[in-house]
């Protein structure tokens, strides 16, 4: 099993996918400098109650607070999730599209081993890259704002970043499952992007009155990554974090179902 993980990391290290992903992440960071102060998907009556994308929206440029620095550090998370979807779908389907996976199966490697080693490699690399992504923004915000965080504040930000990272793993589990079922990178990416951005639109309309909405809409909102990002990015966790384990377990279950489908699926 360890050799299979080594093989996956070797393929990733010697492919253009990782370089491309890192390049796109760097481009997003550069775009953040160009855009400056921004608030997307905002709603509410003032900065404290706004949900969603908030970049450099300081209540006071002279006396920045930890929450405003943390918001800016997490602001571009949704953009990274799209990058993560592209990475997961392209890297997972590459060997299927080229047909090279047949060689591994012909040499007696079990399909489930190939499936799970590739899936776990995607999830681990994505999580590490995302944490570096957030840390980079955090350092930039500290330098630009002059705010010096305490150790407990850094731990708080790490907790929010890990929560968003957990959502990323769940989202990529969905995309990997769809890759097994649909086997088309473009369609899978389109479905996942529609799933993400439709969640933002629906939640914006409902977020201030979630207690009265219908159960199907609640399932859609609580099962959408934008629900978590738009709250975590605004430092809102009360009543939000409780839904995350169910979302994560549900998506990981799809990943397991994908492995079962993989056993019976014909490799073309």
Task: Give each language-model segment a name.
Residues 25-91, 115-183, 197-201, 208, ...:
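Secretory targeting signals
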Residues 16-20, 113, 187:
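Residue-level recognition of membrane-helix boundary sites in multi-pass small-molecule transporters
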Residues 87-107, 111-112, 119:
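Transmembrane helix boundary and interhelical loop/hinge segments in multi-pass membrane proteins
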Residues 1-25:
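Aromatic- and glycine-rich beta-strand/loop motifs that create alpha-glucan
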Residues 11, 248-268:
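Junction motif at the cytosolic side of a transmembrane helix
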Residues 21-28, 187-199, 217-220:
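Central hydrophobic cores of alpha-helical transmembrane segments
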